[in-house]
Structure formats: structure tokens, C-alpha cells
Regions:
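A residue-level marker of the well-folded mature domains of exported/periplasmic proteins
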Residues: 2-4, 26-357
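Sec-dependent N-terminal signal peptides
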Residues: 5-13
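C-terminal segment of classical bacterial N-terminal signal peptides
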Residues: 16-25, 253
Length: 357
């Protein structure tokens, strides 16, 4: 287990006042000491997780300097997303008695007894990038339905509302894939001039998408767009290899994919959409609000990252080759998103600004 921990700063505690002024938010009457924070991450084995940790450590360092928290530590479990290893990690973290425990879990259920122990100790527990049925835990997450809605609508708009599309599906039988496919097909059914000419499972992976499309592309008519879940780079490469016109696609917002797109690969109107590695930061600020006495919904939805054609070059400047684009959440932006959750306006809430580096 790798644990990095910053020293504790002495700071006067300040109430964190939400920008959302609504009668459903109750604020604590007494000032509290700035909280200590621990983050438990199930594994560190891909670019999304590494980007999530980087974003969290940057935001937590600033939050500590601003006196919003007194200290933080990040613990990444060894291995490949093992619930057993994360449970051992969590038990070690609980010995430090943090005020806030943020968890990117290996399982939505296996950690529950250990997380219940944290709740019983009075620790604010927030799960992100996943879910849990543990009633004492808060959930901060992106909606897979929103991801599917935003990327599918972008492809529909990109092809002018008419033409042939292929649906590149995710991990067969998984709950996210089922949810995303339902949204995709519903949107497509509302656009009768868009015809689905093929479906294939690509596991949201560029290499698998390239292989699957190359094996079927000869049998397909002209394809104007590929509706999917971030495998756009592989889809474009398949059409390039086959000598076909390039379709409108949904890329993953990695630095490499964005640069590939920026070099003219992919038809105009393409987009990049993915769940936000900044969810850990959003969970941090939401948990600070809870710690300071605010009442928020048990589950709060935050937007996925959306990179449009006109914003692509700004994102390229902000994202390293091996990083995944993420929103740079602040306390104020999180408060606005919490207000949108309370008011039922999540789908129409304004997105954060494009990061500047």
C-alpha cells in the first residue's frame, strides 16, 4: 500500500457556505475544526485513475493551504481492483481516524461492513465513481446516461440529423452498458432520418473497436457516424485503414486522442466525452460541506467531461499526452452543482470552464 501524507496546518475553522441558498440546506450553528481527509483508491492501473489522483492531490493541497481542510492522505491499494486489498487498506486508514473518508471502490457491496465501521465512528463517508447501497454513505458520481446522451446527441448533430450510424457498445452485460445502450437507442429512435446499420461490442476500447470494425466494415454501407463510449480513435483508424470516408465519432478525452483528433482525424462534428477524473475533487468539496453541517442529497450527479469541436484546441493545451481531461472543480462550482441536484436541473446546469494551464 502506498500512502502519501501532508503535514497538518494549523488553521482557523470557517464554515463553508454554499452558494446554493435554498431552504433545503441546513447549516451547522457552531464552528468546527478543519477536517482531516483520507482517500482510498482501489487501484492505480490506468490513465483515468492516475489523472483522478493528480487532480485530487492538486485540489487538496490548495484546500489545505486555504484552511478548508487540515490534512489529507491518499492510499492506493496494490493489485488489480481487489476488494480484499482495499478492505485492508481502509482498516489501516481508519486507525488514523480521519474526519472525511473518500472512496473509489473496488466493489459497490464488498466494502460495506468496513465503510459502516467508518460511519459508526462519525466519519463522513463519500463514495465516488461508483455506487453503494450503504445508507450512511454519500455518493458523488457521473451519470452513464448523461455520458450516452451527450455523446450520442453530438454524433446526431454532427451528421446533420440524418445518415447511417454504427453503435459501438461497451462491456457486454454490464450495468453501465445496459444503461448507455438504452439512452442511445432512445435518442436514435427520435431521429427517424438516422439509420443504425450495425452494432458491435467494443468494450469502450480503441484497439478492440478498430479490430471489430475492420472485420465488418466491408459489409457496411456508407457510415456517417459511430455512436459509442470513447473508442473514437480506433474507429477512425479502422476507416482510414479501409480507405473509407471518416465518420463523426466520440473520442475519449485523453491527451493523445485529442491531439489525433486535432490533426484532422475524424469528421467535423466529432466530440470527446468520458466520465470525469475530477469526481474525486467534487467528492472532496461535497464532503467538506457535509462535515460542516450542510444537508445535501445522498446521491449527487456531476457532469462527464465534454470536449466539443470548438473547444478542442483549448483542451489539448490543458491535457498531457498520458492524462485524461478533467473538470477543475472548486468549492463554488461544486456548490452550484449541488444546487442543481437539489433543484432538479442537473441536465441543464452550466458546465465548468475549460481548464487553463
Amino acid at each position: 500500500m502506498r500512502i502519501s501524507k501532508l503535514g497538518i496546518l494549523a488553521a482557523a475553522a470557517a464554515m463553508i457556505a454554499s452558494t446554493a441558498t435554498t431552504p433545503t440546506v441546513a447549516v451547522a450553528e457552531e464552528k468546527k475544526a478543519a477536517p482531516t481527509v483520507a482517500l482510498s483508491n482501489a487501484f492505480l492501473g490506468n490513465a483515468w485513475r492516475r489523472s483522478m489522483i493528480t487532480a485530487f492531490e492538486e485540489a487538496a493541497t490548495k484546500a489545505q493551504a486555504d484552511g478548508l481542510i487540515s490534512s489529507f492522505q491518499v492510499s492506493n491499494a496494490p493489485g488489480e481492483n481487489s476488494a480484499t486489498e482495499q478492505i485492508a487498506q481502509l482498516k489501516a486508514l481508519l486507525l488514523d481516524q480521519p474526519d472525511i473518508l473518500l472512496v473509489n471502490p473496488a466493489s459497490p457491496t464488498a466494502l460495506n461492513p468496513t465503510l459502516q465501521q467508518a460511519c459508526d465512528q462519525g466519519i463522513v463517508v463519500a463514495v465516488f465513481d461508483s455506487s453503494t447501497d450503504l445508507e450512511c454513505a454519500y455518493i458523488v458520481t457521473n451519470s452513464f446516461g448523461d455520458w450516452a446522451r451527450l455523446s450520442t446527441q453530438a454524433v446526431i448533430d454532427g451528421i446533420g440529423g440524418k445518415g447511417n450510424v454504427v453503435i459501438a457498445r461497451g462491456v457486454q452485460g454490464s450495468p453501465p452498458e445496459i444503461e448507455m445502450y438504452a439512452v442511445q437507442t432512445d435518442l436514435l429512435s427520435k431521429n427517424p432520418d438516422v439509420k443504425v446499420v450495425g452494432e458491435l461490442f467494443t468494450f469502450c476500447d480503441s484497439a478492440k473497436a478498430q479490430e471489430a470494425l475492420l472485420s465488418t466494415i466491408a459489409s457496411l454501407p456508407e457510415v456517417d457516424g459511430v455512436v459509442g463510449c470513447g473508442e473514437g480513435l480506433g474507429a477512425v483508424q479502422a476507416f482510414q485503414t479501409a480507405g473509407r470516408d471518416l465518420p463523426v465519432v466520440a473520442f475519449a478525452p485523453s491527451g493523445r486522442a485529442l491531439k489525433f483528433w486535432g490533426e484532422g482525424n475524424g469528421a467535423p462534428g466529432s466530440v470527446a466525452v468520458m466520465s470525469d477524473p475530477g469526481q474525486g475533487v467534487a467528492a472532496l468539496f461535497a464532503a467538506i460541506n457535509i462535515y460542516n453541517g450542510q444537508e445535501i442529497p445522498r446521491t449527487t450527479i456531476f457532469p462527464p467531461v465534454v470536449v466539443s469541436d470548438d473547444a478542442r484546441d483549448k483542451w489539448i493545451a490543458a491535457v498531457g499526452d498520458d492524462e485524461i481531461a478533467s473538470w477543475q472543480w472548486t468549492q463554488e462550482l461544486v456548490n452550484a452543482q449541488l444546487k442543481a441536484n437539489i433543484n432538479g436541473t442537473v441536465e441543464t446546469a452550466a458546465l465548468p470552464p475549460v481548464p487553463v494551464r
